[in-house]
Amino acid sequence: NRDLMVENGNLYVLKNAGIISQIPMDTTYEESEAYEGVPFVQMILHGTVEYTGPYLNLSENMDKTMLHLIDYGALPAFCWTNSDYTPKDVEKSVLYYDNWTSKSLDVYESFNSVFSDLRNARMTDRRKLQEGLYRTEYNNETYVYVNYTDSDISYNNMTIKAGSYLRVN
């Protein structure tokens, strides 16, 4: 029975976790030509236990965070409150549930329609193909290309739109 949700869980609790919240999507080291982050934890967990990345409504750049979620096979997540108050600053307004109902529903439905069949698939590879273009491979012969750049990229007779992704089966 895996009904437990954990945040940044450790190995000891994984056997009981149904979902892990807030898995880091970046590295603590500065990336360079000599060092680039690898989604090692995500590659081990994907298809075994579900996980989320950073809360989308708390992200500085929601579009880039969504691309990271797609690239790393993570589910979208939001952090809200339903307190009855008038937000006094931006941070509190991004936490207020009513401000996000429509947007979050769109995000969840979009992710579910495109990626629901990958939730149980194993992530078998993820590599940088060129600057700003990454490919994640799954054991069901699915490839997800993510373009982090501001320009469309042509690769192997495909075009991956700027700031977008392309799923290929």
Segment roles from a protein language model:
Residues 1-169:
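Active-site-proximal substrate-binding groove within the catalytic cores of carbohydrate-active enzymes
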